[in-house]
């Protein structure tokens, strides 16, 4: 060891354990425009001060470990460490705090959601000094977001590809989700598309099982798409699920979809992983494919109020990793989604610039600069009576996806699709005429049903169906 190295390693080094807050709690720190900012909901163990808990989160998700190490002297901790710069109590909750942490940009690999999450939501979530920990929000600085391609195409390019403007897009998940043969599956797709839907969808569970191998499904669905397009004169699509056990197999399926000339493929981005998702998004941009994203497994991560990660963070991560659509709850259907919170992350998906708004759970102002937007998909337990509310809540730049609400029609798939298309067109026309969809929605649907027997039959079947449970996702 050289004398110079000897001196650097020994000066200022004192072995042992010291409180995290001595190094990582810095309430006087002024955040930089290039910092990644995080808001954590922290529940410390009894006897652990909130400042120590917040500092521990900053340390364990950046440069710190449980004891002082001599190699700290070989780098500049001030340059690289995370800093807990503010702590506030959570209103109405005992022993819960919001800890704000700033991370210098040099901690993260460019263009890698995988690397960002490995640090920020890594081992720190198993830290013993905390009873629970939840990441509520992230501020992604433009200096970092510009290192990502983002969505393969974005909202405007998708509308131009489909030649569809001025209304939400309509979709349907084919049911039963498992067990159909490829030929019967393709027939169900055709019936829905010819009835007036823009898209049909593979269920997230459908990959390449013994009852229906992926290549057979792709071929029969492509046949259904082209047949429905010829009959209706509209561009149609089916979300062909390319999710697979390996990245290589996933790309092989996307290549086959491109060779068939279909417009869109699909990926389960959480079970598939961010590395696979980003690879697929790059392929889709290079080859003109739209990319639909399903969020299977999200509730394992985001449903508990005091531990895990809020979906708004997963939504931001998806916009960076890449996807043209993502499921975002419905507010009115069978799946979780409180209105103001849902609209908060819908704006984070679609808009270029979103102001901080704690009433909607948005902890930081987010500037996406030129990153394309993502269409939110409302799906899960919705039917024609929900159409006015969905049109009013989500607006034009959305996909409204009715699975059982199409296939459960008493007359079959095509009449179910007709009912949904008629209901949507009636709601859009009423809105454009200045009518109040929230107050007059049922009246608008009843009026349209008078000249659409398909809609009238759907209204009768689902007039009593409600999913009324208290939302778990509250502020």
UniProtKB/Swiss-Prot annotation:
| GO MF annotations, alphabetized | magnesium ion binding; monooxygenase activity; ribulose-bisphosphate carboxylase activity
Post-translational modification, briefly?
A: The disulfide bond which can form in the large chain dimeric partners within the hexadecamer appears to be associated with oxidative stress and protein turnover.
Propeptide positions: 1-2
Give the reaction(s) catalysed: 2 (2R)-3-phosphoglycerate + 2 H(+) = D-ribulose 1,5-bisphosphate + CO2 + H2O; D-ribulose 1,5-bisphosphate + O2 = 2-phosphoglycolate + (2R)-3-phosphoglycerate + 2 H(+)
Q: What's in the keyword line of the UniProt record?
A: Acetylation, Calvin cycle, Carbon dioxide fixation, Chloroplast, Disulfide bond, Lyase, Magnesium, Metal-binding, Methylation, Monooxygenase, Oxidoreductase, Photorespiration, Photosynthesis, Plastid
Cofactor names from the entry are: Mg(2+)
InterPro entries reported for this sequence: RuBisCO, RuBisCo_large_chain_AS, RuBisCO_lsu_C, RuBisCO_lsu_C_sf, RuBisCO_lsu_fd_N, RuBisCO_lsu_N_sf, RuBisCO_lsuI
Cofactor descriptive note: Binds 1 Mg(2+) ion per subunit.
Q: Where in the cell is it found?
A: Plastid, Chloroplast
Broad EC category: lyase
Q: Where does Mg(2+) bind?
A: 201, 203-204
The record's SUPFAM superfamilies line, in alphabetical order, gives: RuBisCo, C-terminal domain (SSF51649), RuBisCO, large subunit, small (N-terminal) domain (SSF54966)
Query: Can you tell me which residues form the catalytic site?
Result: 175 (proton acceptor), 294 (proton acceptor)
Keyword Plastid, does the record have it? yes
Post-translational modification N6,N6,N6-trimethyllysine, affected residues: 14
N-acetylproline-modified residues are: 3
Instruction: Detail which positions bind substrate.
Output: 123, 173, 177, 295, 327, 379
Residues of the site described as Transition state stabilizer: 334
Gene Ontology cellular-component annotations: chloroplast
Q: Which residues carry this modification: N6-carboxylysine?
A: 201
> Which GO terms fall under biological process for this protein?
photorespiration; reductive pentose-phosphate cycle
Q: What else is known?
A: The basic functional RuBisCO is composed of a large chain homodimer in a 'head-to-tail' conformation. In form I RuBisCO this homodimer is arranged in a barrel-like tetramer with the small subunits forming a tetrameric 'cap' on each end of the 'barrel'.
- Listed PANTHER family: RIBULOSE BISPHOSPHATE CARBOXYLASE (PTHR42704), RIBULOSE BISPHOSPHATE CARBOXYLASE LARGE CHAIN (PTHR42704:SF15)
Q: What is this protein called?
A: Ribulose bisphosphate carboxylase large chain
**Which organism does this record belong to?**
Corylus cornuta
Q: Which gene encodes it?
A: rbcL
